[in-house]
Amino acid sequence: MHNTSTTGSLLLAALATTLAPAATGADDRGALLERIDELVSDSMEATQTPGISVAVQHRGDLILAKGYGLADVENRVPATEHTVYRIGSVTKQFTAAAVMKLVEEGKVALDAPITEYFPDYPVGEFHITVGQLLDHTSGIKGYTEMPAFWEQSRLDLSHEQMIELFSAEPYEFEPGDRYQYSNSGYYLAGLLVEKASGKSYAEYLEETFFRPLGMRESHYLYSGPIVPNRAEG
């Protein structure tokens, strides 16, 4: 599933070029749909992506909503326009937006030290801000880079256990010195959303983004509940 973002990037670039004639009426709808099918198939083959769902909208007109390939390879379940996919690290966009929403409400400050929200976090001599969590300049080691995490990844670790896992690691660099992608930083940012809002991360996203924007098929991923039309892989 790690190829999904690459496939999406290829498609966005290709579709932008394909839709340009549509604005002037140069291509008829049938030819346009055939071209989109061709682009999707080529991108899936190039990235070895088993399944994908595509929606194309142009100036308010829904041109296409369609699934390609398989949502479940083992059981040969086809992907449709209703297939629900895990979005992985795209979740960080929602986390950052949630933090910024709380900044607008005066409940969070980007330049505030993280110890304001996590008093027991071992920052040592460093000063780490909320903003540095969001822009990957905190220097906190990413837990996905740690063998110890993968050894326990199937366990239902508590927030305290997760923080203990990566907070014990040496800093990768002095905070603010450079950029380095860190899932740990965004783990803390997600917890900050809960602390500042007084709601669970899932509740805050539902109330702030999903429901107001009509994102009826967007969910927070729990291991227990059944999600209709969820892709497997």
What are the roles of these predicted feature ranges?
Residues 9-18:
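Bacterial N-terminal signal peptides
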Residues 17-28:
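Bacterial Sec-dependent signal peptides at the C-terminal "C-region" and cleavage site
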Residues 110-124, 211-213:
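Short, glycine/proline-biased beta-turn/loop segments that scaffold the active-site neighborhood
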Residues 28-87, 107-112, 167-168:
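Short, conserved catalytic-motif segment at the N-terminal edge
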Residues 1-10:
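Bacterial N-terminal signal peptides that target proteins for export
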Residues 72, 125-233:
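Short, surface-exposed loop or secondary-structure junction motifs
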